[in-house]
Amino acid sequence: MSATLFNNIELLPPDALFGIKQRYGQDQRATKVDLGIGAYRDDNGKPWVLPSVKAAEKLIHNDSSYNHEYLGITGLPSLTSNAAKIIFGTQSDAFQEDRVISVQSLSGTGALHISAKFFSKFFPDKLVYLSKPTWANHMAIFENQGLKTATYPYWANETKSLDLNGFLNAIQKAPEGSIFVLHSCAHNPTGLDPTSEQWVQIVDAIASKNHIALFDTAYQGFATGDLDKDAYAVRLGVEKLSTVSPVFVCQSFAKNAGMYGERVGCFHLALTKQAQNKTIKPAVTSQLAKIIRSEVSNPPAYGAKIVAKLLETPELTEQWHKDMVTMSSRITKMRHALRDHLVKLGTPGNWDHIVNQCGMFSFTGLTPQMVKRLEETHAVYLVASGRASIAGLNQGNVEYVAKAIDEVVRFYTIEAKL
């Protein structure tokens, strides 16, 4: 029996995003560009450790009480409490009324996993709606917990803009009380965010059907460089849904603190206004603790301590804000550089959507065929959907990338005419 025990296990394809990283690493060509994985790079194409993070690490190491002891099951309180403040805002009614539950998670993915486990236990029959397109891992996270997913229109490819009517129609047609996963800012993969006015329409529509909103907040500070501006959608949702349904928030510090490998994040839940919250809050917290205990026992401490220092030390907080502006402004600069090079080359099509988008990514509009040719002919690596990590561009490679895109677009434009 032991010889055949695993014979029926299916071989799965490599993860789409990490597969790109692997192929890029194996590519021996002298000139190559990785626009696949979502990680910030400086203008030399190197990983950047934020100055605020370096300073926080020094404080931690110089502390006489520094140790590697276990954290509690729900994480480091100085992280979770301060993380909640930057996403909800200290003036939020949810804070004033003690309606917020916060636990530490393994970055944003871990927070989404906690959400999925919670939904599967308490709301197993609710549909989970994801934007079309969405982050490649969203569907798997929810479906692996036995939840059913559906999609709502988001990206209008013809106009390279938000399909607001399709979005609102999907909200109205969804079964009452469904779960809508919303990207709070710097939408992945499109880089296209609703305007403030559009967010009001979206949240009002969600409230009218008693839906549950889950905000995936992976890029706070990356869309505009301003934490408060990037928290607008979450704060609006908490305000407008306060008497309708709880609001779930999955928060990551991978991007805005450069803590990719340390897996620092938080799961937050803003409860509705109701008299029973004095009993509901400890009950829900106990269930979240049980999920965490059975999965990871307790969350990792080192990265959590670093981010906590950023959030609770005024001079480090100030430097961190400057660091976020440094990253977001360089990405914006690269958006304009890429668009300008394409315009200068006369590349067929309109490329203004690149500068109209925000955050780390651009949904370029390139087809899977074009992306394949970019990789095979020019060693420029993108996700098959056409998503490009603008953070991978710099002064030394942006012109090369523009020329590669120009060649590929012209190749398929000419081929289509033959």
Curated annotation (Swiss-Prot):
Gene3D superfamilies per UniProt: Aspartate Aminotransferase, domain 1, Type I PLP-dependent aspartate aminotransferase-like (Major domain)
Phosphoserine, modified sites: 389
Keyword field contains ATP-binding: no
Subcellular location: Cytoplasm; Peroxisome
UniProt cofactor(s): pyridoxal 5'-phosphate
Catalytic activity: L-aspartate + 2-oxoglutarate = oxaloacetate + L-glutamate
Enzyme class per UniProt: transferase
Modified residues (N6-(pyridoxal phosphate)lysine): 255
Gene Ontology biological-process entries: 2-oxoglutarate metabolic process; aspartate biosynthetic process; aspartate metabolic process; glutamate metabolic process; negative regulation of translation in response to oxidative stress
GO-annotated molecular function: L-aspartate:2-oxoglutarate aminotransferase activity; pyridoxal phosphate binding; ribosomal large subunit binding
pH dependence (UniProt free text): Optimum pH is 8-9.
Pfam family, one: Aminotran_1_2
Gene Ontology cellular-component terms listed: cytosol; peroxisome
SUPFAM superfamilies on file: PLP-dependent transferases
UniProt-annotated binding residues for L-aspartate: 38, 135, 188, 387
EC numbers for this chain: 2.6.1.1
Chief location of this protein within or outside the cell: cytoplasm
Keyword annotations: Acetylation, Aminotransferase, Cytoplasm, Peroxisome, Phosphoprotein, Pyridoxal phosphate, Transferase
Highest taxon above the source species: Eukaryota
Transmembrane regions: none
Residues found modified as N-acetylserine: 2
Family: Belongs to the class-I pyridoxal-phosphate-dependent aminotransferase family.
Misc. remarks from the entry: In eukaryotes there are cytoplasmic, mitochondrial and chloroplastic isozymes.
Entry protein name: Aspartate aminotransferase, cytoplasmic
